[in-house]
Amino acid sequence: MAVVKTHFERRGKVGNAKAKANVRYIQHRPDKDKERVMRPLFGSEGPMTRLEAYQFIDDAPKGTKFFTIIINPDPEKEDTHKDLDMRAITMTTMQTIEEIITAQGITTPVIWVAAVHDDHTDKNHVHVLASVQGRLDKPDLDRIREATTKACLEQRRELDRALSRQAQEQKRDGWEPEPTLEEDAWGD
């Protein structure tokens, strides 16, 4: 089951500062070698700049909560080959949050920024900062986790089917894998 962790800060001087610090973190967290990395940010409309993220933080209406969300597929059951489309999974997760908020009668859209972290741990994950009006209770978080897990498992099945078809086609066509460098070195 995918892990979806959340925490929130209320809009205000301190909350806005923490939200902006979170944007800097998700964009620049050091990689495995402790090197500073510049990760591309994205939101529901596609690529997003850090200044655009800061702007939606500054423009957040009264009553806004800034949710920090971490989306982490299960590496043994869902992201076995580290090949899931994490942006698509993020879109599904955020769409679920939008549906929950809309069901509360809130018409203010959920605005968010995210970055994929696939370079400092063996577990691919996404960090999201979302500007949310309304509430997310435990049943809501369970629903978000279930929708995210379902999206991960559906992608895993599709990817595994594609890999299986590719292997069958290669076998049928008499394809053999390229020798490894060790095999080349020994003349095998």
Where in the sequence are the language-model features?
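N-terminal nicking endonuclease/strand-transfer module with a His-rich metal-binding environment
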Residues: M1-H125, L129-D188
